[in-house]
């Protein structure tokens, strides 16, 4: 999204998405480091090709909000599994991500 916005001369939009991209990389590192700290193996699977063009910034932000809601559902599912398994360490780690998703959705919603 950042590259598409940049190509369209939308530097502010491009920067917003670039900052989000960097933040998502940090989140991935937190998950990977946590998995390693639990003496488990991190498996990185191939990522499917992603969309690279949008009709407008509004469409970009709408897609972003939709995606963030999907991520929220996945994190909530992980939190439910951790609670059910009485995995308190994972539950504790996931609290930060639950809170973070509230902010992520709000940030995308604010841009719409």
Question: What does each model-identified segment do?
Answer:
Residues 1, 33-34, 49-112:
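Acidic/histidine-rich alpha-helical segments that form the ligand environment
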Residues 2-46, 108:
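Conserved alpha-helical segments that form or flank metal/cofactor-binding pockets of metalloenzymes
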């Amino acid at each position: 999204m950042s590259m598409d916005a940049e190509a369209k001369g939308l530097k502010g939009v491009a920067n917003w998405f670039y900052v989000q991209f960097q933040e998502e990389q940090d989140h991935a590192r937190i998950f990977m480091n946590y998995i390693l700290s639990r003496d488990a193996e991190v498996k990185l699977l191939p990522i499917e090709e992603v969309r690279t063009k949008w009709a407008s910034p509004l469409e970009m932000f709408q897609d972003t909000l939709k995606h963030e809601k999907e991520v929220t559902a996945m994190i909530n599912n992980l939190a439910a599994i951790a609670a059910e398994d009485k995995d308190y360490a994972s539950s504790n780690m996931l609290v930060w991500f639950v809170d973070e998703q509230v902010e992520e959705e709000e940030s995308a919603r604010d841009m719409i």
